[in-house]
Amino acid sequence: KAQTKIENNNYGIRKNLLEYDRVNNEQREIIYEERRRVLDGESMRDVVYKMITDTVEKNVDALIGDDQGKDEWDYSAINHSLRPIIPVELITPERIKGNKKDELKHQLKQEAVKLYEAKEAEFPNPEMLRELERVFLLKVIDRKWMDHIDDMDQLRQGIGLQAYAQRDPVVEYKMSGYDMFESMTDSIQEETVK
């Protein structure tokens, strides 16, 4: 009877480990696919454009509610959040055309893309910038991925405590791992855009 109990317990542990590995493998495949695209020499121009617009979207969405009017926006927070990443002009009520969040996002995206295009124009050969983008993006992905692996390992070591709180450790690992992965990809975007 004791042996059966121990075997069942060990089976449960192995099953959980397989689930943890499945989460890690899914994330690994996504990152390796991104790395492959960079290493295959694809132009990263469209990727960087998307990163720029996504960064504007996320920062504005995080700070402005859909129902807030221009007079309710926290301009200091918007500037503090966005300008260290994308050096757009100081964001003030007078400078913003329109009164809606979507109009602000559109204006800031246009400004950010113009800044990128101005940087692009500084290079006599656009392929030089493409190569720099590939090298930089690869370094950022690799560094952030290594940090993420360490963080996921720490999460796995501490996740067993969730069982004491009557939570399924596998579900908690998946949810926390997903949040951490999203945070890592956001961080990759922001650092690349800078």
What spans do the regions from the language model cover?
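Extended, charged helical/alpha-beta scaffold domains that provide interaction surfaces
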Residues: 1-194
